[in-house]
Curated annotation (Swiss-Prot):
This is 20-hydroxy-prefusarin hydrolase FUS2. It holds the Pfam family FrsA-like. Belongs to the AB hydrolase superfamily. FUS2 hydrolase family. Keywords: Hydrolase. It is an enzyme of class 3 (hydrolase). It comes from Gibberella fujikuroi (strain CBS 195.34 / IMI 58289 / NRRL A-6831). GO terms for molecular function: hydrolase activity. Pathway: Mycotoxin biosynthesis. The active site is at S238. Gene3D superfamilies: acylaminoacyl peptidase, alpha/beta hydrolase. Disruption phenotype: Accumulates 20-hydroxy-prefusarin. The gene is FUS2.
Amino acid sequence: MHKVFASDFFNFEFLRLLGTVPFQGAEVGECLTTAGRIKDGDPESWYRAWRDQAEKAQALAEEAAAVGDKTGACWAYIRAANYWRASEFLLHCTPKDPRILASSKASVNAFDKGWVLLDATVKNFEIPYEKDIKLPGRLYLPAPHHRLPGKIPVVLQTGGFDSTQEELYFYGAAGALPRGYAVFSFDGPGQGLPLRVGKLKLRTDWEYVVSQVLDFVTDDVAPEYDLDLERLAIFGASLGGYLSLRAAVDPRIKACVSCDGPLDLFEITRSRMPPWFINGWLSGWVSDGVFNWVVDGLTAVNFQIAWEFGHGKWVFGVETPADVLRVMQKISLKGGYLEKIKCPTLITGAADSFYFTPDINANIIFEGLTALEPNDKHLWIGKGVEGGGLQAKIGALAVVHHKMFTWLDSTFAIKRDVL
């Protein structure tokens, strides 16, 4: 695979943007020009370059809107939203940086201006969560000429460790709408604006979060918008793949698509550390103080490690690397949890992932679905960047759309004419 950046981390995040080109999330020329302004490994240059490109895309959107070019305005606003999202992404080592919230709000604002121009109906919602706390949700409905017979099948889409609801559009609604599916996406605690504004931290019992969302969808949204609750699937990618499996125990979910999720997040992190060091910490021989000192030293020379622990502390609401690992120990599908899943399930893996390799994740998750008949579970391992081999199917979103909706069509008995 050709690399734009020598750093695997920077290259992956660049491909994350470039991979949205088919769905108006980026323009090839804009991305290549922006890449030329970024110093590999330097988050400040990354921020400035994508901020500048976001402003340019937003200006194009406003120019198009001023002359009534609905399509041009829609596409440019959606690109701007994605560039704004990318600009603040590598600043997460310092969550109090005001540029994070400013860029996040700019991303949401640009996306809200873009979706009203889509060939679809889109509605924003506030989902009751706890006490007076509400979570942002968004319903995408297919245009009349894309509707399937009967009520509308719907995909409930959850984010993951570092996504935002606006980015989820490219993974879900962009492929669902032309196929006649509705999508209901949301940002939960530890994600998007609930993290940045509400300071809500990610919950490891994600099934609780999804139960609140499902209450709202089934009671308030589905009746008004003709959603088919007998054809309701959940979908998540990367850590979202894990979160979707946590939620799949709810009987209201009729199918689950878990894209490249982990079996046990702590065990994956553990495998990347010297055995004597991590085992020493687990046994108490290495104290928290020593562990934190070593990790902090590594973050000074390795930006990827700095970002992973910095973002982890922010999302989990903890102060030290040792505490990050303690939260990770709770992010696991071991101990019989997979046996509770009764709905048809599609598990995907990424052969070339540098995070969640299939041998210790997708393959074991698939085998753990013991309550399902062979015909009710399916495993797909993507290979190569063009075939879904990178984590979360980066660079192959059209491929994952094809695989996912072909499987959902079969699961929900949706018949289409052969072309």
